[in-house]
């Protein structure tokens, strides 16, 4: 016998005589239908227990990942691993303490794998929305695959990846994190500056190969050699040795003067202007970030001050219990009928957010179109010809209304004062409506 049938048998055996006064109250309120008894298991969702457990686990996992002790432990292990990698560069220490260094590497890799798995438990799709998580997963995946693929288990691959993981640790320190964020935010502008410098290098390399390729083949034999020579000139280290090769045994002043002008122009554009642009881009972004941080700090201070003032001034008034009872309804409540709504999933929440965003974008576009239409109407109405027509029509309607009001009909003397005023008001309203319609039509 199912649990549902057992429940109904228990309900039938219960004495419900004590419900008589309640039924009479229902009848007095005009509710002649009988009270419906519902099994609570039909109302409750079976997935709720699992959802509660999943929510609790995610909450504890999130607290663990964000806990300062866990972050400090991870930073300590990564720093120790970086130190062991630096010590392994010495062949004597690497052979003597090989087992210790390999054990530290395995422990650090295990902790990194556990961190990735905990991030997946916290939210699989949320994990991939952070760029640092993607970088950590790529590093851990390559290091883990090194146990199975020998080509990946190389010192040239594993050591740089382990040291690269320290970048995420630097994000925990606020000054270092600020500098890293500034560099990452400056990457598009820095890419534009690099493209500009590369363009100048290509142009000057073509000039150098064309003008000096036959005389100084050591530095301007082809495009590759010329680009390398110009890169040395940008660094401002070694360009003087390149220029000394222009001074041949047989003095040719044209070559020396041409080379001097060539290097002077390129070093001025590439080294002084180009490299200083890098510094300008980074410093401007750093200043903007500092200003935004100061503004946010001032806003937080203002919010805290206002909250403190509200706590001191705005106190809830005291209410007597009798007044509170008057507001609460004493009508007997019906039990919940029907099943609950389906649990909200992440997919439906994302779809709902997308719909809200689309509605907001449509409203913004509607406002822009409405503003453009209003501007067009204003421009059309500001034309002199349209203004003259509008004035003529207004004068025509105002003159008609004035003549109508000044010359009342013969039967008006026989009417009451109220009827005459109502008729005149209707005439004036009709004239105003006609004028407004004419304005909107133009």
From Swiss-Prot:
UniProt GO MF annotations: calcium-activated cation channel activity; voltage-gated calcium channel activity
Record's protein name: Cation channel sperm-associated protein 4
Residue ranges the record marks as coiled coil: none
Reaction(s) the record says it catalyses: Ca(2+)(in) = Ca(2+)(out)
GO cellular component, one term: acrosomal vesicle
Physiological role: Pore-forming subunit of the CatSper complex, a sperm-specific voltage-gated calcium channel that plays a central role in sperm cell hyperactivation. Controls calcium entry to mediate the hyperactivated motility, a step needed for sperm motility which is essential late in the preparation of sperm for fertilization.
Membrane topology label: Multi-pass membrane protein
Species for this entry: Mus musculus
Extracellular side, ranges: 89-98, 154-156, 213-222, 235-255
Major location (coarse): membrane
Free-text activity regulation comment from the record: In contrast to the human ortholog, not activated by progesterone. Activated by intracellular alkalinization.
Tissue: Testis-specific.
Gene designation per UniProt: Catsper4
